[in-house]
Each structure stands twice: as C-alpha cells, then as structure tokens.
Regions:
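Rhodanese-like catalytic fold shared by cysteine-dependent sulfurtransferases
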Residues: 1-35, 43-83, 92-129
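Active-site flanking residues adjacent to catalytic metal/cofactor-binding acidic residues
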Residues: 38
Length: 129
C-alpha cells in the first residue's frame, strides 16, 4: 500500500509551519518560570533516559485532549500564561504535535532536535530514584 504522504514528509511540513527552539536556547531557558517544557515521550522513555528538570509529562496520545478546555481530560497547566515548548526524543513527534496544537489555536513551540540532542549538549537531566 502506497501512502499519500510519508511520516518524514509530515514532519518536514510541520517544521516549516511551527516555531522551533534550538537546544542551546532551551538549555538557557530551563529555569525561566515563564517557560513550560512539556515532554511527549512514553513513560518508559522517561524512566530509561531521564527527563528535563521541571518538565511536565504529557503522553502524546492525550495531548489534544489535555490542552482542550472543553475536554473532560483538560489539564489546568495548559491554561497558564506561559511559553510552552514541547519535546520528544528526536523532534519528530513534537513537530507534528505542535503543528496540530497551533491548528487548534494553542500557541506552542518545539525543541528542534529533541531530548537526544539535549543530552548530547549537556542539558540537565533528572532521573527518578
């Protein structure tokens, strides 16, 4: 079965439309109270590799429901007046997610190259336990 559009093309299209934050810039903002970093990765990814201190975990499958004030799953954190920066491991899931959120009317940005580059560039990482 041939697809109309590949996942790589979806990511490229999304990245052309959204705000992308470079890793070094987000590392500099990690303690800024006006910025909320949101981790879209699976819980197992967070357990295995750690997470950005102060980040809020929102599993990708719940994102649209958690940001929608009319949804029974709405999370109050998304009503706060902050800059929301979403990330995943490589930037693919977060690019598509932020494109979807912007389409919904929720202003957001994403970490361009994801958590893997965050770790590579020495960004702070927290682990449980």
């Amino acid at each position: 079965m041939a697809l109309k559009k590949s996942s790589a093309q979806m990511v490229a299209d999304a990245r052309a439309r959204i705000e992308e934050i470079e890793t070094a810039d987000l590392i500099a903002m990690v303690d800024d109270p006006s910025v909320q970093i949101v981790d879209l990765r699976d819980p197992r990814e967070r357990e295995r590799t750690g997470f950005i201190p102060g980040s809020f975990h929102c599993p990708r499958g719940m994102l649209e429901f958690w940001v929608d004030p009319d949804s029974p799953y709405f999370k109050d954190i998304f009503a706060e007046d902050r800059k929301f920066v979403f990330h995943c491991a490589s930037g693919w899931r977060s690019a598509i997610s932020v494109d979807t959120l912007n389409d919904m009317g929720f202003k957001a940005a994403h970490l361009k190259n994801g958590f893997s580059e965050w770790v590579k560039l020495g960004g702070p990482v927290e682990t449980k336990g």
